[in-house]
Amino acid sequence: MARLVAVCRDGEEEFPFEKRQIPLYIDDTLTMVMEFPDNVLNLDGHQNNGAQLKQFIQRHSMLKQQDLNIAMMVTSREVLSALSQLVPCVGCRRSVERLFSQLVESGNPALEPLAVGPKGVLSVTRSCMTDAKKLYTLFYVHGSKLNDMIDAIPKSKKNKRCQLHSLDTHKPKPLGGCWMDVWELMSQECRDEVVLIDSSCLLETLETYLRKHRFCTDCKNKVLRAYNILIGELDCSKEKGYCAALYEGLRCCPHERHIHVCCETDFIAHLLGRAEPEFAGGRRERHAKTIDIAQEEVLTCLGIHLYERLHRIWQKLRAEEQTWQMLFYLGVDALRKSFEMAVEKVQGISRLEQLCEEFSEEERVRELKQEKKRQKRKNRRKNKCVCEIPTPLQAAEEKEINQAKENLDFTENSCKACGSTEEANNCVEVIVTNESTSCTCPSSGTLLGSPKIKKGLSPHCNGSDCGYSSSMEGSETGSREGSDVACTEGICNHDENGDDSCVHRCDDKEEDGDSCVECWANSEESNTKGKNKKKKKKSKTLKCENEHIQKLGSCMADPGNRETSGNTTHTEFHRDKTKDTHAESCCSSEKSGQQLPWFEHMKNVSQFAEPTEMSLVPDTGKGAKSLVELLDESECTSDEEIFISQDEIQSFMANNKSFYSNREQYRQHLKEKFNKYCRLNDHKRPICNGWLTTAGAN
């Protein structure tokens, strides 16, 4: 803590202040000299961090002497700007501004090693500027105490004022150790000056005391006479009851009108002890009937006056010490910032930019990690898709293009067996496991690969079961879900010479794309057209049935074999899953006496079916539906059922007795062909394995 070392008797303007000394104004009659000890700012006795000190020395050596001189100079505006931002107490801010102005005017080295110039420029002494170690201690040891000091100051919650600048501080408090603290910080000269009591000041304190305790007139007069004896205006020998021992240690100067009090600490403590009940509080009526009692009242007032003076000095000392510390630490902080800015200017990069670069680098690393994760997930999905479709898409498309070209060349030639120009290799192999299972065919992407290929059935194609129950007994009409007919190869029996042929009479233009194959392959197209053309297609179905009955003769065998009554004629009714009713007639004839074996017929048909067998493979890349999807979609119910009369069923069964006799043989062959189809397409449709097991079980 600062000490009071001297008294400015001739005025503070004439006093030779040394380093770290400032004047302390007590009252109109007293001004003391306040000094901060050297150990407060010891720049050599601190143990510094070796790494940080080495780094600071390197930065200090980077600056030239001229740049260092400029960096070690800050204006008053910078210091006071930091003051307004950091110090909330109004009294502290005003005290700092006042002290800085006094130092600018006087030029005293009060802030050593800081120096205040006449133009308000704050700088550092040359000895400290050239010594990097001292400068480091000043900036990073003492300069770091600014925030701690400001935070340690108690503040009022109402107006943010500190206790030293609060209005309550000026009121006298009960006696404590504060007077002893300030008494020990004073030099002997200061103590002698403190105990020199002015007579007029003591009289004011005495009158206040008499009014406060409501002395009567006689007692009041007694106290005033005791005061006059003390200052030497009355002769004490003429006063009856006067006690000279009470005024021992007190000496008056009548010419100068002041009183000298003994400087011994015990005597001061005795005087202040008399005044202690007064500061404890309470007003009471007092009396002084005799002179000795009046002398004690005068000593009490002397103790009150002395205590108030010591309390005022203690308060001024603490406030000025706090003001000096604030100004010193604010100046050090401003100089440190100026030095760091100069070093950063030389380095070309600031600490803030370094921090921003660190944040940017962290952000880049984070984004890189996220990008790697996204790429990893993308590769995982890609590998999963490759595993599901092992055949490359481009190879499949090239194969489909080649097959489409072959189909186009083949369909240009007419069917030699029956003279029809319909496509002979578009028959679809389907096995119907039970009456509730709907037929399914490959997607339209491969089946109808070229727009020039006609849509229709094979000339060797006949329907199996035609949507009826497999049993001879109890044949019932099937619903729309179960009446989807699978156009399969080799149902019809033909001669070896190919005389018996099935001519497909359905006109493409008239049917508007409703052929047998299209009811399987173009199920999505018929979905979009079904609602708009429902009535039109119903009429087309009836028309197609009538044409089939009238043109039944064209489906007969050659004339030599027509005498037999075993002619077989069956009609296939194809019903779409999307409630579009398609009626296709496909007829075949066989001789009851001379029927070709089933395997011979399949041998002939396979010559046409094998070249384009790969073209029937569904194209998974073009949105075609698999066999399972088509079968699942065929499960939908239909609000409109197309029934076949019982007479037609009985007539069909009577005319096709030979078909029913060879029924198991036909079924076995269909299973073999379907198994062969699934094996050929097993690499594209792994799900066919499940259908193979299901078909075998059924």
UniProtKB/Swiss-Prot annotation:
It comes from the Eukaryota. The gene is GGNBP2. GO terms for cellular component: cytoplasm; nucleus. It is found in: Cytoplasm. Keywords: Cytoplasm, Developmental protein, Differentiation, Spermatogenesis. Residues 555-575 are annotated as: Disordered. It comes from Gallus gallus (Chicken). The keyword Cell division does not apply. The keyword ATP-binding does not apply. Transmembrane segments: none annotated. GO terms for biological process: cell differentiation; spermatogenesis. This is Gametogenetin-binding protein 2. PANTHER family: GAMETOGENETIN-BINDING PROTEIN 2. May be involved in spermatogenesis. Its main location: cytoplasm. InterPro entries: GGNBP2 (IPR026073).
